[in-house]
């Protein structure tokens, strides 16, 4: 490590100031998370049943302060809402922050969490950084610049699905798993690491063939979506509609998405569509 940034990541410099800042902020947040990890305390439960720690609040507040100093006209949308967020997402540039994606792991002193920073322009991801401080894995991407892990270029291989394929699925499902998910469990191998952003980054690496989440938030995916897209992968709503550009009036709504390498994504979409046709 040098100045808190993995040495290999210094081999590739993002081409614009917002992308560089996204990387800086993800690493800054990750350093705070790592310092607080062993003594994580102050756990509370939010009304939606998710965990919140003091580290979530501390990291988000710090990142928002840095953004306000560097880009005062930009909008910030953070999971915990610690800053003076605008009620409407006006403006071209949005900073979408998940201070700790995987808080349920972090708060239990388990690995499987990260800091995610995404930059959207007119509703489309243009830069992102996802940092896992325990593994020291830093995923970065910016529009037209490719996807990177600690300075090495990554690509999502266009591999078809097979019995050896791994996929990630959100839980819980209060109304029970839908038929297409039962089919996936019968044919492929489930992995769940507890962080949507890391799931998407693992798909960009080719480790996961596809990822499905029926109730994600924009901050869960904003930083990692461009990593997957720049790696050659795909992400859409679960019904196949384009996810981006995302409109301001729906940016805070739950998102059901499907993502993965371009081949697996298409095949998984076919499964979802077929199940819906049967239901009709």
What residue spans do the PLM features occupy?
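Oxyanion/phosphate-interacting regions
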Residues: 2-24, 201-280
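N-terminal subdomain of lithium-sensitive/metallo-dependent phosphomonoesterases centered on the IMPase/IPPase/PAP
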Residues: 1-100, 278-280
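Residue-level detector of anion-binding/catalytic polar loops
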Residues: 73-75, 189, 209, 234
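Acidic beta-strand-loop-alpha-helix segment within the catalytic core
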Residues: 10, 117-201, 243, 247-280
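Active-site-adjacent structural elements in enzyme catalytic cores
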Residues: 69, 77, 85-152, 226-229
């Amino acid at each position: 490590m040098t100045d808190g940034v993995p040495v290999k990541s210094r081999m590739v410099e993002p081409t614009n100031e917002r992308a560089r800042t996204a990387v800086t902020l993800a690493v800054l947040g990750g350093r705070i998370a790592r310092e607080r990890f062993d003594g994580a305390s102050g756990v509370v439960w939010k009304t939606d049943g998710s965990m919140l720690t003091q580290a979530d609040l501390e990291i988000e507040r710090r990142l928002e302060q840095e953004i306000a100093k560097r880009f005062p006209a930009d909008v910030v949308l953070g999971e915990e809402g610690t800053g003076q967020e605008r009620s409407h997402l006006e403006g071209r540039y949005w900073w979408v922050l998940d201070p700790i994606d995987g808080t349920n792991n972090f708060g239990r002193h388990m690995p499987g969490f990260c800091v995610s920073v995404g930059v959207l322009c007119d509703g489309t991801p243009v830069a992102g950084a996802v940092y896992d401080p325990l593994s020291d894995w830093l995923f970065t991407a910016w529009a037209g610049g490719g996807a990177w892990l600690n300075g090495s270029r990554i690509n999502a291989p266009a591999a078809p699905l097979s019995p050896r394929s791994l996929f990630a699925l959100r839980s819980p499902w209060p109304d029970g798993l839908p038929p297409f998910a039962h089919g996936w469990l019968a044919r492929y191998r489930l992995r769940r690491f507890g962080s949507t952003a890391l799931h998407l980054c693992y798909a960009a690496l080719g480790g996961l063939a596809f990822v499905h989440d029926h109730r994600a938030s924009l901050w869960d995916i904003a930083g990692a979506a461009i990593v997957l897209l720049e790696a050659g992968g795909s992400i859409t709503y679960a019904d196949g509609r384009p996810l981006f550009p995302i409109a301001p009036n729906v940016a805070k709504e739950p998102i059901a998405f499907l993502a993965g390498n371009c081949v697996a994504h298409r095949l998984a979409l076919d499964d979802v569509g077929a199940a819906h046709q049967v239901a009709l």
